[in-house]
Design a protein with these regions (language model features):
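Loop-centered beta-sheet repeat module
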Residues: 140-199, 499-558
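Residues forming anionic-ligand binding surfaces in small-molecule and nucleic-acid pockets
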Residues: 114-122, 196, 473-481
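Generic secondary-structure boundary/loop-capping signal
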Residues: 19-22, 47, 103, 192, ...
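Short, acidic Gly/Pro/Ser/Thr-rich loop/turn segments
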Residues: 113-115, 173-175, 202-203, 254-255, ...
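Long, compositionally biased
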Residues: 99-113, 458-472
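Fold-independent oxyanion-binding glycine-rich loops
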Residues: 27, 109-111, 169-171, 198-199, ...
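Alpha/propeptide regions of enzymes that mature by internal proteolysis
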Residues: 1-98, 120-157, 165, 203-247, ...
Length: 713
């Protein structure tokens, strides 16, 4: 089998709608049989069916697991997760028919976590570990192939990188509490998988206090923003709505809880007490359909969750003063049955060996070899060969030896040839090469040096790329529904190319240089386009000095994004008030710029100290329903910016009450009534339009940004 034949085979999977936009691992009869055998059930066994679809067999699940890049040992876990998804009680339709970007959040407990080497420590939500990356991807490919999403049904307004994969193992060995699954009646020695119908989680940074009350009240604020009261497609979920809060507590925070004598039950009780809003505050953001609001006085306290047991407290992640907080509408947990152990031979071919693969299985062995040596973020790659790489260099319009930039974690230059190799591995089209090279030049430029340094910190910073102008349409970069993923090949593979360049050439090896406490699914890649034709205000890039007809790129080194869901607000001010709230929660007052080097050696480099406080930018991506509300009201981009700025202040007293008294946003002499902004001016809010027709907006805070016009536009 020639390299060209292998690439053609992968192209066939794309054309048949069997991919999420990135290369898959091809299926062979022998490998499919091994995967089925590892599951301990016959291939024809029926597991259930998604609504309105054909029955799902074990063989179908095995094929999805193979395509995703799973090893056979993962099959019992994947099968059990599918059994949960296929249970009629599970609101599976929310995962692909909802506008709200729901995804299956997978939590693994018990011995199988260590057996499969599922990550539970640094970068647990991000790239770097094959098991985490491929198990979640197997579920996504199953939803695509067996439930008809996204090609024939995913109506997600904006999508989410977490829809590609979200698999977390609990760090039972370093937890102050008993493993989560024991609270559901399982033994510690049982292996279990929990699947939640979740929406995008939020990282909470608090490095300025060790008091449990301060930390938990900051978590509660994220769980109580007005967006938590969105109706969440209840009709799709029918009777299955049973809201849960998932709190993934990283090492530093759980150590503070342990030292203060707080167990899980005490944490749950406190969280239930402080997680909620006054009815008037919820109405002020335009939310009205929640039955608990009907007839309630404005000062009535409305809890978000029904009881203490709805707060699922999990130990995972490394040091860095952070935790990940998320919500879900349903959760189910099941024991993973023991299954036959299937011997998996070590890769026969490895990087750098002289190899002449003759068969499909030879190629798969070589791909396994690349992945085993850390040349992938966890997903299958295309094999780089001289002809393919040469074609990509030629398509870039540059010489292979041309220098793209320099990384602080690599001694030599990064060249066009380096970029071409990784773009090919990522599955990128040769048509995308000029854009990928331009992105990498901007990525490694002095303009974004602070971002490159912060990208190796515990904070989890990552590049967000926005493509402007005619080139976005010419290359098919998605600016509509589900633009943040999955499904759009250009978005997926261009973003993945950048991540592979960072890992393989830039030196950002996960858990070696990239020390993210929790990581983020957006670290796999984030490339989007602006829907300029739908914008009431014209494109965004003229704001950065370009002409509307220019093609350009904007790069933001960003922290964790917030997804604001609001299907009820019909007026401008309630809508924007909810968006501003998600940009100004208390954790925004703690950042790498909130300390000096003597306080945190792992945060961004010395040149960034304090800069986040005055230089932070907000990218605001307005989905269809939200931009139409603004269009009908005749609001200009400048009016939106001014409103968001006016509503991005918190009082000094609020900061002190939640443990942020030493934040450099504050000075000791300031009165508690003094109001302090997160963003220092209306021009810091960059408002653009994209996405489908639902009521969703994505907001993200950026440490630094840079822009570049593309040649040949």
């Amino acid at each position: 089998m020639s390299p060209g034949e292998y690439v053609a085979l992968i192209e066939g999977y794309h054309e048949q709608g069997m991919s999420d936009g990135m290369p898959v691992m091809p299926v062979s009869g022998a490998r499919l049989a091994a995967m089925i055998a590892a599951g301990g059930q016959t291939g024809g066994t029926h597991l259930g069916a998604f609504p309105g679809r054909a029955p799902v067999r074990v063989e179908d699940v095995a094929e999805c697991a193979l395509l995703a890049g799973c090893v056979p040992a993962c099959m019992p876990l994947v099968l059990t997760a599918f059994e949960i998804l296929l249970d009629p009680a599970f609101p599976a339709r929310l995962l692909y028919e909802s506008a709200g970007s729901f995804f299956p959040f997978v939590l693994v407990n018990g011995p199988i976590r260590a057996e499969l080497e599922i990550n539970c420590r640094p970068n647990v939500f991000g790239p770097g570990v094959r098991a985490n990356a491929t198990i979640g991807r197997a579920l996504r490919l199953g939803l695509i192939r067996l439930a008809g999403a996204p090609n024939a049904g995913d109506r997600s307004t904006l999508g989410s990188a977490y829809k590609f994969t979200c698999v977390v193992g609990e760090d039972e060995e370093n937890s102050p509490w008993s493993p989560l699954h024991t609270g559901f009646g399982f033994a510690e020695t049982d292996s279990t998988v929990m699947v939640l119908a979740a929406w995008q989680p939020r990282q909470v940074t608090h490095q300025l206090s060790a008091k449990p009350e301060h930390l938990l009240s900051t978590y509660a604020e994220e769980l109580s923003t007005a967006t938590q009261f969105n109706p969440l497609d209840v009709k799709l979920a029918e009777a299955s709505i049973a809201p849960k809060a998932l709190l993934v507590i990283a090492a530093d925070h759980r150590g503070f809880m342990r030292d203060a004598g707080w167990n899980r039950k005490r944490m749950q009780a406190y969280l239930h007490q402080v997680t909620g809003r006054r009815a008037g505050e919820v109405r002020a953001a335009g939310y009205r359909s929640d039955k608990r609001l009907q007839g309630a006085a404005d000062d009535k306290w409305i809890p978000v969750y029904r009881g203490t047991e709805d707060f699922l407290v999990v130990s995972a992640g490394s040091g860095g003063g952070r935790s990940m907080i998320g919500g879900a509408v349903y959760a189910d947990i099941r024991k993973i049955p023991a299954a036959p152990r299937v011997a998996v031979r070590a890769p026969a071919l490895a990087i750098g060996e002289e190899a002449d693969p003759q068969t499909l299985d030879d190629y798969v062995a070589l791909v396994d070899g690349f992945m085993a040596q850390g040349a992938s973020e966890g997903w299958p790659i295309l094999l780089p060969d001289a002809d393919s790489v040469g074609a990509k260099i030629a398509a870039s319009g540059r010489n292979g030896g041309d220098v793209v930039g320099h990384s602080p974690w690599r001694s030599g230059p990064i060249t066009v040839a380096d970029v071409a190799i990784n773009a090919h591995m990522a599955g990128c089209s040769h048509l995308h090469m000029p854009l990928v090279v331009a992105i990498c030049e901007l990525l490694f430029s002095p303009e974004t040096a602070n971002g490159l340094t912060a990208g190796a910190s515990t904070a989890g910073y990552h590049p967000w790329i926005v493509v402007h102008g005619p080139i976005a349409r010419a290359l098919g970069i998605n600016c509509g529904a589900s633009l943040f993923g999955p499904g759009a090949r250009a978005n997926s593979t261009i973003g993945r190319s950048v991540r592979l360049v960072l890992i393989n050439i830039g030196g950002y090896k996960p858990n070696v240089v990239d020390r993210a406490c929790l990581g983020s699914a957006y670290k796999y890649g984030c490339v989007i386009a602006e829907d300029e034709s739908a914008s009431p205000w014209g494109p965004l890039h003229p704001e950065f000095g370009f002409k509307p007809q220019n093609s350009a790129i904007s790069l933001f080194w960003a922290a964790h994004a917030r997804l604001t869901l609001n299907d009820e607000a019909g007026e401008v001010e309630p809508l924007l008030r909810g968006i501003a709230e998600d940009l100004t929660t208390m954790q925004n007052f703690d950042s790498p710029g909130a300390r000096g080097p003597e306080d945190d050696k792992t945060a961004a480099g010395a040149e960034t100290w304090g800069q986040f406080i005055t230089n932070a930018d907000a990218l605001v991506v307005l989905g269809g329903r939200h931009r139409e509300i603004l269009r009908r009201a005749g609001w200009s981009r400048r009016q939106i910016q001014e409103f968001l700025f006016a509503h991005n202040f918190r009082s000094a007293g609020e900061l002190r009450s939640k443990g942020y008294a030493t934040s450099p946003y504050l000075s000791p002499e300031q009165d508690d009534a003094v109001r302090i902004p997160v963003f220092h001016g209306p021009e810091k809010f960059h408002v653009m339009t994209a996405g489908g027709q639902g009521g969703a907006t994505m907001v993200v805070r950026a440490l630094c940004k840079a822009h570049r016009r593309l040649n040949g536009d």
